[in-house]
């Protein structure tokens, strides 16, 4: 007698969560998973001289990427700029996040809202606005010449510094919000305990606040790094020759030369790089910290 | 499936199939086609019967098209013209390729350059126009039609619409007209404007002018290494490689750059607005022409009518004045306005002798290799 088919022994599957998740999962599958699969398939294809694609299965596009230093050098530049951007956002983001955390002002919520304000303006407009600020006839040069500090306009645009400026403006709120949420989650009793045990303000920060805020810091760093590595607009609008990043290279290959297979291969390489970073982060720190910034406590 | 669909669509357009049967077929095909693009494309095609899509450069050009061609056309035929826009040729072609197989998504497009015509033909996106149904084609300069005939001798898939030049724009506050005329293409390598030079990010234009600078025929470059060396020499001098006409105008107007390769129409717009910008068409200046291309899968009866509307002198002249590029109309056959006669690149003879156009086969054959090499050179390698 078999008993495995008896209802009593059958494992109950709770379908309710899946039913609730199905619209989101369907959307993700159709709008994210399938397009990514297309990109992966394309990366093995070939480009015809006319710009059409030829179905094939070969690794030539990947080999081409690594065969000389030109393409990897753009990838290294992307990583370098991303790390530099993370560092600057961290330095510039921790202080305001800490200030909001400690503030008892009745305007505190309004100040936090100000951090979100740039999101209400188009990213392109925000990036383009730097031209009016840093340009030869821009506000900054105009002001410096007016007060007699310089006689000739400074060359502030179309270099890596300008690209970083555009990136920081875009990404700083992500860093601030992650750190702020992390700071808000710290039990204030711990600080009081530290103070009661003889710590001064600085020691309490160094021994209690800073270590406990590190999950927020790391989440902010991850978010800023991933977003920078995939960015396209700031290098295009504010960068000069030699400031291109990997996303610009993908654009040039796909749009400029209609080389979809090679563009797809570069996209897959970028995807693998960022995927590895996110996987490593999740493995050691947990990805759930990222969602806290958008949920609040 | 797609061949069968095209056959059925052809039968329907020929009147051999009733609308009911056609729609019924679409329904069956839609069920059979599954998820991958099928039903969406089919519904699109079914809905497209009362409309035709035109993609152009937007702005004042599209306004002129709407006012002088599309609206009268809709009033006369009841067929709506869906007016789309693109930023540049390559991104548009990418969209067209993504919509392949053709048939409903894209119909007419304002393509730039004969090499683009060749590219579309190479991708088999072309169709066969019946010239007898486009009466106003007789008013067009034969010199502008000829390059297209050479690519598709059996039938045109486009009508020429306007011409222009990529010359050199320079700020007269910093560079005198005499100096610009004296230097010609070498102005783009003049050390006195180091750091205040601009250029288009596109590979073809840069190679063209480097060929002129090194004393070579751009359509028959013998020493390509000299061209790359010239471009390597130029890269540190360039402040910004611009990517769009709007950016070009902004760079010139804000004096970020004092000289750059530039599209004649954009320079004319700046001059009209009072900016101190001169335009130089050096010997061997890069001339180009634009056409209205008809995609494969387009309803040709509608396309013929619309092309005829667009080539009518009142529409063509209005569009030319809007975008500041001379029309394809032959000045010996059509009386053009003073404004058009004063535009850069205008040829009163209608023969276009002395105008140097890019050889489509020469440039298209080398596109992949040179575009990729250009990326490296621009990156300082």
State where each predicted segment sits.
Chain B
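N-terminal export signals
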Residues: 15, 21-43
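A ligand-binding cleft/hinge motif common to bilobed small-molecule-binding domains
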Residues: 116-119, 253, 259-276
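Extracytoplasmic ligand-binding site segments that recognize negatively charged/polar headgroups
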Residues: 59-66, 89-90, 110-253
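Mature extracytoplasmic/periplasmic domains
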Residues: 47, 290, 295-358
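Early extracytoplasmic/lumenal segment of secretory-pathway proteins
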Residues: 49-118
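N-terminal secretory signal peptides
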Residues: 1-21, 44
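Periplasmic-binding protein-like
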Residues: 228-234, 242, 271-296
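C-terminal segment of N-terminal export signals and the immediately downstream linker at the start
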Residues: 16, 38-58
């Amino acid at each position: 007698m078999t008993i495995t088919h008896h209802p009593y022994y059958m494992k109950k599957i709770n379908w309710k969560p899946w039913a609730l998740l199905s619209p989101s999962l369907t959307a993700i599958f159709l709008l994210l998973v399938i397009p990514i699969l297309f990109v992966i398939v394309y990366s093995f294809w070939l480009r015809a001289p006319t710009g059409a694609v030829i179905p094939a299965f070969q690794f030539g596009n990947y080999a081409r990427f690594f065969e000389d230093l030109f393409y990897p050098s753009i990838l290294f530049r992307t990583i370098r700029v991303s790390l530099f951007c993370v560092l600057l956002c961290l330095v510039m983001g921790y202080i305001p996040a800490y200030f909001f955390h400690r503030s008892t002002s009745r305007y505190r919520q309004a100040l936090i809202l100000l951090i979100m304000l740039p999101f209400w303006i188009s990213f392109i407009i925000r990036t383009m606005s730097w031209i009016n600020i840093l340009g030869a006839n821009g506000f900054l040069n105009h002001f410096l010449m007016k007060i007699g500090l310089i006689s000739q306009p400074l060359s502030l645009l179309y270099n890596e510094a300008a690209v970083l400026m555009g990136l920081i403006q875009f990404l700083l709120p992500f860093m601030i919000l992650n750190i702020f949420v992390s700071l808000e989650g710290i039990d204030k009793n711990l600080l009081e305990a530290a103070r009661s045990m003889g710590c001064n303000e600085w020691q309490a920060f160094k021994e209690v606040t800073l270590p406990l805020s590190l999950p927020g810091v790391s989440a902010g760093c991850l978010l800023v790094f991933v977003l920078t590595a995939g960015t396209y607009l700031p290098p295009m609008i504010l960068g000069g020759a030699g400031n291109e990043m990997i996303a610009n290279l993908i654009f040039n290959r796909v749009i400029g030369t209609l080389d979809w297979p090679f563009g797809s291969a570069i996209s897959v390489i970028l995807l693998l790089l960022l995927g590895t970073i996110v996987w490593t982060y999740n493995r050691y720190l947990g990805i759930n910290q990222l969602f806290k910034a958008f949920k609040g406590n | 499936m797609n061949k069968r669909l095209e056959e059925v669509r052809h039968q329907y357009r020929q009147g051999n199939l009733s609308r009911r049967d056609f729609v019924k077929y679409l329904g069956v095909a839609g069920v059979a086609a599954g998820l991958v693009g099928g039903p969406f494309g089919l519904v699109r095609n079914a809905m497209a019967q009362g409309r035709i899509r035109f993609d152009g450069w937007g702005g004042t050009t599209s306004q002129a098209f709407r006012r002088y061609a599309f609206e009268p056309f809709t009033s006369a035929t009841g067929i709506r013209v869906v007016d789309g826009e693109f930023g540049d040729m390559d991104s548009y072609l990418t969209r067209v390729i993504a919509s392949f197989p053709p048939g409903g998504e894209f119909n007419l497009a304002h393509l730039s350059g004969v090499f683009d015509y060749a590219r579309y033909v190479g991708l088999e996106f072309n169709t066969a126009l019946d010239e007898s149904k486009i009466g106003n084609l007789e008013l067009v300069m034969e010199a502008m039609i000829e390059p297209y005939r050479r690519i598709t001798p059996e039938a045109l898939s486009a009508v020429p619409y306007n011409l222009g030049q990529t010359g050199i724009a320079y700020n007269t506050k910093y560079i005198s007209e005499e100096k610009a005329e004296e230097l010609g293409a070498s102005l783009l390598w003049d050390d006195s404007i180091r750091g205040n030079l601009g250029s288009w990010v596109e590979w073809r234009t840069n190679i063209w002018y480097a060929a002129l600078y090194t004393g070579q025929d751009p359509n028959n470059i013998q020493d390509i290494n000299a061209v790359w060396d010239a471009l390597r020499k130029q890269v540190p001098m360039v402040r910004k490689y611009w990517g769009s006409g709007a950016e070009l105008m902004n760079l010139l107007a804000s004096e970020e750059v004092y000289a750059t390769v530039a599209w004649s129409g954009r320079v004319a717009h700046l001059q009209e607005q009072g900016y101190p910008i001169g335009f130089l068409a050096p010997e061997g200046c890069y001339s180009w022409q634009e056409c209205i291309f008809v995609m494969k899968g387009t309803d040709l009866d509608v396309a013929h009518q619309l092309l005829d509307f667009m080539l009518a002198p009142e529409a063509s002249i209005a569009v030319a004045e809007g975008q500041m590029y001379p029309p394809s109309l032959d000045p010996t056959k059509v009386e053009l306005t003073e404004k058009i006669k004063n535009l850069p690149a205008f040829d009163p003879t209608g023969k276009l002798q002395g105008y140097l156009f890019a050889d489509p086969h020469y440039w298209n054959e080398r596109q992949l290799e040179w575009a990729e090499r250009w990326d490296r050179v621009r990156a300082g390698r």
